[in-house]
């Protein structure tokens, strides 16, 4: 009988949907990855890895600030996990999907990791992202935005 090994599963960081309220609707911030980055030219959310003993909330605040120059007003955990196979590392990655609410008048300042950004309502955001799991995440977040903040138990503090 052949001995087998498992594909490694890792959870190195977070996927953060940055949202703002605009004209009684929510808009999603999507970032376009710069040409020198992995997944160059693709559109998605803020992503980032945990450093040291950071909590998830601390990772979110740091990564949102680094990639966009924004500071979240509130952060909450969704029930959704973004999961995919990462060929570069030959691992399955599972990342919690976190929502970061920013002020409606927020001005984005991009880092070198991204070359463009745009605020989208959910239907257009789903057409712009390059990954099916992010399309599903947008649907899930949109549904959660209808009930939040009444479910304040999901809010996390840095």
Where are the predicted features?
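Short aromatic/basic micro-patch
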Residues: 44, 92, 119
């Amino acid at each position: 009988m052949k001995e087998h090994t498992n594909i490694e599963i890792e959870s190195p960081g977070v996927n953060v949907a940055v949202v703002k309220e605009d004209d009684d609707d929510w808009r999603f911030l999507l970032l376009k990855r710069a040409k020198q980055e992995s997944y160059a030219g693709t559109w998605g959310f803020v992503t980032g890895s945990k450093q040291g003993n950071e909590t998830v909330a601390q990772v979110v605040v740091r990564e949102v600030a680094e990639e966009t120059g924004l500071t979240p007003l509130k952060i909450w955990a969704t029930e959704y996990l973004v999961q995919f196979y990462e060929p570069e590392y030959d691992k399955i990655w599972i990342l919690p999907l976190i929502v970061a609410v920013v002020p409606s008048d927020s001005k984005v300042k991009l880092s070198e990791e991204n070359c463009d950004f745009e605020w989208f309502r959910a239907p257009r955001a789903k057409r712009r992202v390059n990954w099916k799991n992010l399309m599903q995440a947008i649907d899930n977040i949109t549904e959660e935005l209808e009930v939040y903040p009444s479910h304040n138990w999901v809010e996390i503090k840095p």
